[in-house]
Structures are given as structure tokens and as C-alpha cells.
């Protein structure tokens, strides 16, 4: 496989590190029955397109039985090639984000800094209410369950042998966070990068990313749509790489009483 294929597969299979999963002949279904509304740990990926239709039926039955909304993270041209299949099975399709992938290729040129105390979080007790409020409180207005979902996710992450979660503390306050995931395809994936609203613009994210780059001992990648974050990643040595036909993700969600395709 070439590097682009490895990135795509690493992306699709990364949740194996922090979710329960069931592998099938056509792909994989991720789930977490203690965090049912967190999309990134409750979705299916169909790898073999030739089994797309039977996969839809299995996905719908599997998640419905668990009381979880059936959801599929689509890849390639699946949103287009299987548009009618998805609609006939009751799945609506929507676009998500405007993302670009980046591969770590060059040396880090971020200016050295020593403002933070960077710690690796290794137990559930490290996921404090102070940390959650600092990092995710800003999203509560649009999503009242953000902190609960994030608490459940981070507590799974710190118990995983394939994840490393780091927090940058400024004067003992959680200021920023980032995760490294070791994927089954020999790559490191940067994810869950977040800076507390009150600490933005002070170079803390740059310091944390530079720290993580030094830890990478395998090819590393990430995806982002945030211009400010992208500038940091490029200074850290990441370079854009096109791995998918469009700079966005497509998701399919089962709509129990509305068998329509939301994507036009």
C-alpha cells in the first residue's frame, strides 16, 4: 500500500484504539454503549463496496438493537455511487467539514517555548472537571451534552494502550490537549487537539504540538479545517496531502421514519 492508502485506512480504523468494535467481512462497526451519542465511537465503515447493500442492513440492525442511531462514515465516492442504496435503506447523507489531510514530512520550525508544564494523562482520575470545563465549556451553548461525551471519551482514551493523551498546564490550569493514536497500519494520528478559549492566542498549542512531534517514531498525519491550526501544523513540519476526492467528509445517518436522502 502507498502512503495515501495507509492514511485512509488509519483514519477509518483509528477508533479501534478507544471504542468497542465488531469486524465483519465488509468492514467494521464501532460502538460504546456508555457513550451512545458520541459519533466518533458509534459508527460503521464499509471497506468493501461490493458488499455495500448487505452491510447497510447489518449496520441498521446492529445499532438499532443497541439503542444507538445507525451511522456510517463514508469514504471515497460511496456517497455518490451508493446514493440510491442508502436512500432505499432509510439513510440520509450529509456533508461534514472542509478538511485537509497533512503528513509530517519536514523538520519542526516552531519557535522553542517553555510556558507549559506538559503532562501525559494516564488514568481516569486525570480527566478532571476543571480540565473538561476549561477545554469544552465554550461548546455548551450549541451542545449541552459536550462535556459528558468528552468525559466518557477521554476516560476511554487514557486506558488504551494505543493512545497517548497530553495536556499542557499553565500555572496549574489545563490550557490545551492533544492525542497521539498508534494505528494498526504503522502510523501515528494526531487528534483531539483543543485549546481552552481563555488561553487561545498565546502559543500554547504550538508548544504542545512541537512536543508531540518530537515523540513521533512512525509516519504521522492529521486532518484539519481550521486556518490558525493549519499554520501551526505547517510550522511543525506537516505538509498537505490529498487522500480523498473531496475536502470534506460524508456521513450517512439512519432516519427511521424518513426514508430520504438529505444529500442533493
Please identify what each model-predicted range represents.
Residues 51-123, 247-249:
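Acyl-donor-binding surface of acyltransferase catalytic domains
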Residues 2-10, 43-49, 97-100, 107-152, ...:
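Short amphipathic alpha-helix that is part of the acyltransferase structural core
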Residues 79-93, 206, 226-243, 248-250:
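Conserved active-site alpha-helix within GNAT-family acetyltransferase domains
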Residues 72, 190, 220-225:
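Conserved hydrophobic beta-strand within the GNAT/NAT acetyltransferase core sheet
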Residues 143-194:
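A conserved beta-strand-loop-helix scaffold within acyl/acetyltransferase catalytic domains
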Residues 1-65, 78-79, 83, 145-148, ...:
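N-terminal charged segments
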Residues 35-41, 182-190, 200:
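A conserved beta-turn-beta hairpin within the catalytic core of GNAT-like acetyltransferases
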Residues 52-60, 195-197, 201-214, 235:
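Conserved acetyl-CoA-binding loop-helix of GNAT-fold acetyltransferases
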